[in-house]
From Swiss-Prot:
One of its GO terms (molecular function) is cohesin loader activity. It comes from Homo sapiens. TPR repeats lie at residues 107-140, 379-412, 459-492, 499-532. This is MAU2 chromatid cohesion factor homolog. Heterodimerizes with MAU2/SCC2 to form the cohesin loading complex. The NIPBL-MAU2 heterodimer interacts with the SMC1A-SMC3 heterodimer and with the cohesin complex composed of SMC1A, SMC3, RAD21 and STAG1. Plays an important role in the loading of the cohesin complex on to DNA. Forms a heterodimeric complex (also known as cohesin loading complex) with NIPBL/SCC2 which mediates the loading of the cohesin complex onto chromatin. Plays a role in sister chromatid cohesion and normal progression through prometaphase. Belongs to the SCC4/mau-2 family.
Amino acid sequence: MAAQAAAAAQAAAAQAAQAEAADSWYLALLGFAEHFRTSSPPKIRLCVHCLQAVFPFKPPQRIEARTHLQLGSVLYHHTKNSEQARSHLEKAWLISQQIPQFEDVKFEAASLLSELYCQENSVDAAKPLLRKAIQISQQTPYWHCRLLFQLAQLHTLEKDLVSACDLLGVGAEYARVVGSEYTRALFLLSKGMLLLMERKLQEVHPLLTLCGQIVENWQGNPIQKESLRVFFLVLQVTHYLDAGQVKSVKPCLKQLQQCIQTISTLHDDEILPSNPADLFHWLPKEHMCVLVYLVTVMHSMQAGYLEKAQKYTDKALMQLEKLKMLDCSPILSSFQVILLEHIIMCRLVTGHKATALQEISQVCQLCQQSPRLFSNHAAQLHTLLGLYCVSVNCMDNAEAQFTTALRLTNHQELWAFIVTNLASVYIREGNRHQEVLYSLLERINPDHSFPVSSHCLRAAAFYVRGLFSFFQGRYNEAKRFLRETLKMSNAEDLNRLTACSLVLLGHIFYVLGNHRESNNMVVPAMQLASKIPDMSVQLWSSALLRDLNKACGNAMDAHEAAQMHQNFSQQLLQDHIEACSLPEHNLITWTDGPPPVQFQAQNGPNTSLASLL
């Protein structure tokens, strides 16, 4: 018996020593791999060699699966060898499913593998993989929620918003059952965002009301609570801005700005909630700051506070540049493109066409780096080029750009914006496009079935109808449309539309010989245009003031207005020549495919300047 016991003890000791040796070689290889991965610069080839050296030891299944996951992750994140990355991740997923209590490896492998499939445009392989992982992860709240978010995002990228909303609804109910009101709010707010994108406003309102109650009642980590509030307020603000309600949005926007100030003062401790389902964060604090700058720029642009828009754009772009040095998140490029889109429109209004053109070129370069970004912003890019073409009086190119943009968009508000601008191009062109123009005006008829709910776009449609009636010589009809624009733009502080309507009304009264009423319109138009500042309206107003004062015998005032008009003309003319001389001016001929990679310099401008003088 004693001999048997001694032999057993000896065998156990040998087994323990063997296990210890196995542990030591594994830990040594793992340590080396991690050392090489975190070196500066990372030595990825050596890291991969160390991890591959694990397999000849015939390790247990757990170590084998985890090593395949580590190799797949390193190859996916640090190399272009997607084939090997896929092979390792597929093995990790396959082996880990056979091992009980191995959730972290199993679901991380599924999550990474589906990401890789999407990157390779194998979405049909990613969907069933995620569905299976979701099905078997119900006892693991963190992973179940994360995988639901991931599949919802995949459907969103495919523009299948109905399926994405369904999944987010499932996630919200699951989060409620497992007692995570925080993650329930994240699911519901994400669903609200998609419903806003789909324009399902009847569903959005009760959902946002419920979200507001959940956010206010939730007692948890202050940063998480404030980030939920930022998400909620961003949705409210963008909802108002989409509806063109620039004045009504002000209280929400002010709350949002106060909220982001509160977040920036909170200490950024690592959040370790007791409920694993709460281990999510909507956006990093720095990204939220940029987002709040962005919606502030959107508001300033719509309201016609263009200097304020410029100030916040500069702040946001500076912060984005810092963030992009450390973080290659695609959302940062999206923020940058949206900011540039808004500031380009500001530049065109304030008479800085050359700068606007260079920024359009910058958007092209960002879109060249990301096919998805280009797909999402191609219509906006052609719209901006159309607006630039109008500003330099290249009307045929403007028509081509707007027509291209219409072909590329399904977004109703953008469609209405493009059609409104295209109609104004046709109006300025005279009788060349009468049939098409009548068709367009009927499709954006603000008196009948206007296609979108935007207050701002509807007011703009009234203005375009007024402009058309003015060119047709139907002055009473023009006055009716323009007064409607004024009523709507005053109600929501739409300063640019107010200025444009006032100066056009002033022009009508001048043509009708009612000089006093004309003056009553043109003087406030000039004041408002100076405040925006809108160079085209200032040019137009100063010309009218010159003619008005001349007609009324006010020689000194007429001379002063003429001098102002001359100054504005010179500024616009200089900027016009500079813009048309840039190699980027060739972008106006691009109407198909991805953005051109480079531009050939021209000998000089080839556009008419008559409209400016």
